[in-house]
Amino acid sequence: MLFPEYIARSVRQGMEEGDLLPSITAATTRFEGMDYRSITAQAGGDSKELKAVDEGASIPATTIQVQANLVKLRKRGRMLVASYEAVRYQKLDLFSVTLRQIGSHIAQMLLADAVEVLIHGDGNDNAAAASETKGAGVLTYDELVDFWAAFDPYEMNTLLVSSDVLLKMLKLAEFQNPLTGLNFQGTGKLSTPLGATLLRTSVLPKNTAIGLDKRYALELVQGSDVTVEYDKLIDRQLERAAITTISGFAKLFQGASRVLTVKAS
């Protein structure tokens, strides 16, 4: 018998291995329900400046309000069906590998949901500002610098890129720094000359990069942790486990994320 707690623990382990969500989310909120309403506050301008206040004068206020539209939470999951013979005669280590892979697939789907919100917003008219390179199929270092500079007053400390954009970036002369190469070979982690952590993911469309300030860009809303429902079909000698998790994403500050697209060649 595959115990539900063993299944849930193995799936969670797979979700945590190589999970990029902690690198792009500013906060995690646990919420019981299917619809969630986040908060908003305008960044920049007079509403955020700490100006000098004369004696007896009113202190400028920053107003935090709930968003106009709800954030919808989605259920992601997989049904695991195992025969009596598979459970009876195989080692648990083999099942752990399969369960970790299921967890990895769920994590990829959650990342795809996060990318969708970063690019198009969460339904509250907060899609990311987008820019495009001048040359077709070409990404220059000057364009990366301009993209980085557009984040003020935020800081671009994380850069999500598709595989083809990563290849274009690695071929730039500015990325040939020996220390950058040594760090990449030793740890597998690559930092850009602009100081942002570079994360490659297959869930991004081709020719796309998303820059963000991970401190202010995205909120992860968890409706439930990994849940396992277990039963048996005695007449067929099958054991089944439904593995599900409910979560969604809310965009906190619109200016904390931007999209850079390499013009199609």
Predicted regions and their residues:
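Glycine-rich, charged/polar anion/phosphate-binding loops
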Residues: 66, 143-147, 225-228
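Alpha-helical scaffold segments that mediate packing/assembly in large oligomeric complexes
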Residues: 76-151, 262-265
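Broad gene-expression machinery/nucleic-acid interaction feature
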Residues: 75-81, 156, 238-240
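Extended, solvent-exposed, turn-rich assembly/linker loops in the middle of proteins
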Residues: 120-190
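Helix N-cap / beta->alpha transition motif
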Residues: 83, 161-165, 213, 252-255
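Assembly/oligomerization interface modules of large self-assembling protein complexes
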Residues: 1-76
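Short helix/loop capping segments that flank catalytic or ligand/cofactor-binding pockets
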Residues: 48-51, 90-91, 168-170, 250-252
